[in-house]
């Protein structure tokens, strides 16, 4: 006699605790995949936009015209564009307020650009830590469901005159499914978290490099030195 493994049948026959565990883990998995797809697209676009803006920045276009063009755009600025506009605006403001303090101008401008960069990175990292949470807790939630299910299966034997494997097999099977689903939720989440974190770090590095390069240009202007 062979028994066909039917997930729905095992789920319906499981105890309410195991059912709740399975529902939680499946929900975690669905949310994780939604975050993975959404964040992957956002990070891909952010990296592409950063590279595109840097090409435009180094194309020789006048910085005043570049700033005016970006400021007049109706769609929201993000990434390197936002960092550039914040830095250029702060530099211009500080230079008008106190033109004889170049060091203070540069420090204030860098502070403004770093704050803008931190806000951009925070936006890019939105919801990504949830993947780490899913990766950490899902196996333990699944293990809890397994332990509970096995306890439930053996407690059902307490009133039986003769215990057989056939009597406990369905209960053990439904319990082990909780562990399997826990791993199914955790493995993609931890892989995606590591991958997305690396991409965020790469974008942050690009932003940081741009700030350093832009600061060098502003430093020459603040101290009245022409570029070599």
From Swiss-Prot:
Changing residue 177 to V: In strain: 1479. Signal peptide: none annotated. Keywords: Cell cycle, Cell division, Cell inner membrane, Cell membrane, Membrane, Transmembrane, Transmembrane helix. One of its GO terms (cellular component) is plasma membrane. It is found in: Cell inner membrane. The keyword Transmembrane applies. GO terms for biological process: bacteriocin transport; cell division; protein import. It is a multi-pass membrane protein. The chain crosses the membrane at residues 16-36, 137-157, 172-192. Pfam families: MotA_ExbB (PF01618). Belongs to the ExbB/TolQ family. The Tol-Pal system is composed of five core proteins: the inner membrane proteins TolA, TolQ and TolR, the periplasmic protein TolB and the outer membrane protein Pal. They form a network linking the inner and outer membranes and the peptidoglycan layer. Part of the Tol-Pal system, which plays a role in outer membrane invagination during cell division and is important for maintaining outer membrane integrity. This is Tol-Pal system protein TolQ.
